[in-house]
Amino acid sequence: MLGAIREPPIDVQIALHSRDDNQTGLVLRGTRRTVDRVLKGLCSSPCFFCSVSLTMATLTTTMATTATMATTEASKPLEAQARTALTKATNYAWEIFSNRHWCGELESNVTVTCEHIFFLYVLYQHIDPGEGSQYRQWLLSQQNSDGSWGIAPNYPGDISTSAEAYLALRIIGMSTDSPELYRARTFIRAAGGLSKMRMFTRIFFAEFGLVPWTAIPQLPAEFILVPAHFPISIYRLASWARSNVVPLLIIAHHRPLYPLPNGLHKQNPFLDELWLDPATKPLPYGSSDPTDPVAFVFTILDKALSYLGGLRRSPTRGYARRRCVQWILQHQEKAGDWAGIIPPMHAGIKALLLEGYKLHDEPIQLGLAAIERFTWADNRGKRLQCCISPVWDTVLMIRALQDTPASLGIKLDPRIADALAWTAENQHRGPEGDWRVYKPNIPVGGWAFEYHNTWYPDIDDTAAAVLAFLTHDPATARSRLVRDAVLWIVGMQNADGGWAAFDHENNQLFLNKIPFSDMESLCDPSTPDVTGRTIECLGMLRDLLMRPAENAENGEKYGYPDGEGDAAADAHLLQIINTACARAIPYLIRSQEATGTWYGRWAVNYVYGTCLVLCGLQYFKHDPKFAPEIQAMAARAVKWLKQVQNSDGGWGESLLSYREPWRAGCGPSTPSQTAWALMGILTVCGGEDRSVQRGVRHLVDTQDDTLSQGDGGAAAWTEREFTIREPLHEASQRIGSD
């Protein structure tokens, strides 16, 4: 049964690297390192991704398997090797621990860096030659052999990504006669030329006069005035779309025109060589399906707005613009960030400048400083991260390290306590949060994955943080920190029983039919992967609350209120948890595919979703109400995981599975996906299982000690594919787009 939303993968497929990375290899050739995820895989629990996180997932799987492998004589050599790999991965994790937490580079494809070059040229009409050289080095390192740039490593060229890279390289002074741009130009023209650009690329190009603003769907500023309870309002958009759309309302009103190196032109010929017909520059206005009544209505509405001049002369326009500016300023963090991601930072600054702000004004200066914190430069060149994930990296690493054997002494390591204290300090307690629009009365207590993003905590990070605290000290089950986080999580549950990433009931999927949305990523509905991690968190907490209360050594540090932990309080929280899980499990039953898998929106794809759901369901497999169904579902899921195991013992799955579900579980083995698969299988099978043994063998054999910057006692894993998806950057494209 199809219970997940099928949208094409988003272009920001993230990889993380240690800032100490001295490798000269490209992401295309596999320089991403796996710590957290693989660590967790060698011991057992789900993770996201970083140069940190992949190793941890593998490490954790090792420990879950070695605990049972010891009973089998034939497995002892593998057990010893797994423990050695675990020790090396743990050492590597400590190598990259800094300032009480972990944070690796989040690397995307080239679009976010290209758009940063556009942004800098808009502001200054100049790119520093030294800086431009670093950007050029990075962009060219990501170019495919056919001259294109893809939405992820090892994927075919994408015309919009390639067009943005071509323009960025031209802006920083690269000649059209260069062999790199010749090959890029050849690819773009062969793919249909600039007529095939996606909508967001058109917006950037319209700002330079490369395409007319009439080729952009109408975005009337009055959209900000639509009440939140209407079916269409800014709050019906996903958080990542909302934070981009509000400043775009201002930009679309002004329809700015900025110069390029050849000057200011309303019809700029700067990229005429990329058009098949530069005399007419045809731009189809969208691909709305005329047989779809919703898409047809949106198209007619857009044409009517265009006929009316986009309501620019409306008497409400001045008020709407002021409301947009007010919203932008209100949502700017004290540190200058917007939503913790780069696209709304670029758009927010441009919108404020168009409304009369100056470069020296405080909101602009803070925003520019925030953007600069996202830059990353090393011997591979300079690029811009779309976002950063220190909370995510840290809580997953904490949990993975704590699943290591007692002989390593991790639980007693003071650095773990420091990391937990750092995490506690980053719990959200303030009045901010767009989630309050629809859920104003639930307690605050979530976490965001970035340093500065008080407006958008997310359920996935919050559940992962709670799991880290519970794993470290079971007594935190009765802490205020955990209680508030769990009450916030439960309060964000959707009517269908599942959880989304950031929002409540953000499921108006018809919004993906608007002409502006050619990436189908405007909503944040329930997904099995987030729901799986959430019930894992709730299931672990439920089990701990059913045990006798224990005194936590660090109770005051984590905010234990006086009198907390009594039987009545425990019973009340247990009732809330049981009610939420009784709604979530039927959602997961409905969303299991016929193959036995679950869809994963936030990482690739069915391997990831299936792992997270299995890790959650394991806490309920003896529940009298759901036990038979859960056990049957888990058996089908594990059977599928074993069926798709690669001949080398690992697991892999490509981004193509989002477009073509028959590709589920198909792809070259990666450390992260191998770790995820092992974590899922280990919820049903023991370490002596042949698939588990083969998977652990693959991880042990692929560990790479050359990744360490130390004396040889540390090692990690190289990830050659992008295995997570990130709809936070609105530069999304379709796999194999026309």
From Swiss-Prot:
Keyword Repeat: yes
PFTB repeat coordinates: 132-173, 321-361, 482-523, 581-621, 634-675
InterPro entries reported in the protein's UniProt record: SQ_cyclase_C, SQ_cyclase_N, Squalene_cyclase, Terpenoid_cyclase/PrenylTrfase
Gene Ontology molecular function terms on file: intramolecular transferase activity
Site (Transition state stabilizer): W392, F449, W602
Keyword Transport: no
Disruption phenotype: Impairs the production of fumihopaside A.
Domain of life from the UniProt record: Eukaryota
GO biological process terms, semicolon-separated: triterpenoid biosynthetic process
Active site: D460
One GO cellular component term noted in the UniProt record for this chain: lipid droplet
Enzyme Commission number(s) from the entry: 5.4.99.-
Family annotation (Pfam families): SQHop_cyclase_C, SQHop_cyclase_N
Keywords: Isomerase, Repeat
PANTHER family (alphabetical): TERPENE CYCLASE/MUTASE FAMILY MEMBER (PTHR11764), TERPENE CYCLASE_MUTASE FAMILY MEMBER (PTHR11764:SF82)
Stated role: Squalene hopane cyclase; part of the gene cluster that mediates the biosynthesis fumihopaside A, a hopane-type glucoside that enhances the thermotolerance and UV resistance of N.fumigata. The first step of fumihopaside A biosynthesis is performed by the squalene hopane cyclase afumA that catalyzes the cyclization of 3S-oxidosqualene into the hopene 21-beta-H-hopane-3-beta,22-diol.
Family: Belongs to the terpene cyclase/mutase family.
Protein name, entry field: Squalene hopane cyclase afumA
